[in-house]
UniProtKB/Swiss-Prot annotation:
The keyword Ribosomal protein applies. Pfam families: Ribosomal_S16. Belongs to the bacterial ribosomal protein bS16 family. GO terms for biological process: translation. InterPro entries: Ribosomal_bS16, Ribosomal_bS16_CS, Ribosomal_bS16_dom_sf. GO terms for molecular function: structural constituent of ribosome. SUPFAM superfamilies: Ribosomal protein S16. Keywords: Ribonucleoprotein, Ribosomal protein. GO terms for cellular component: cytoplasm; small ribosomal subunit. This is Small ribosomal subunit protein bS16. Signal peptide: none annotated.
Length: 83
């Protein structure tokens, strides 16, 4: 089982927000998550990203691989993720 840290789309039409979640790589985008780590609100001007750093580091230590989009979002918001 390959585990990924990726985005799960939520919200209404034309007003999306995303949860940063840990999922099996074969799961559908909006499928059941193993654990929620935080959120990303692209429409908001302030407080766009919130993530539980301890849980994120724990999952990275267990071998979870963040998606490219999650890496970009977190690096853009001063949370360094190694490539």
């Amino acid at each position: 089982m390959s585990v990924r840290i990726r985005l799960k789309r939520m919200g209404a039409k034309k007003r999306p927000y995303y949860r940063i979640v840990v999922m099996d790589s074969a799961s559908p985008r909006d499928g059941r998550a193993i654990e929620e780590l935080g959120y990303y609100h692209p429409v908001e001007k302030q407080n766009q990203v919130k993530i539980n750093e301890n849980k994120f580091r724990d999952w990275i230590g267990k071998g979870a691989i963040p998606s490219d989009t999650v890496k970009k979002i977190l690096n853009k918001n001063n949370f360094k993720v190694e490539s």
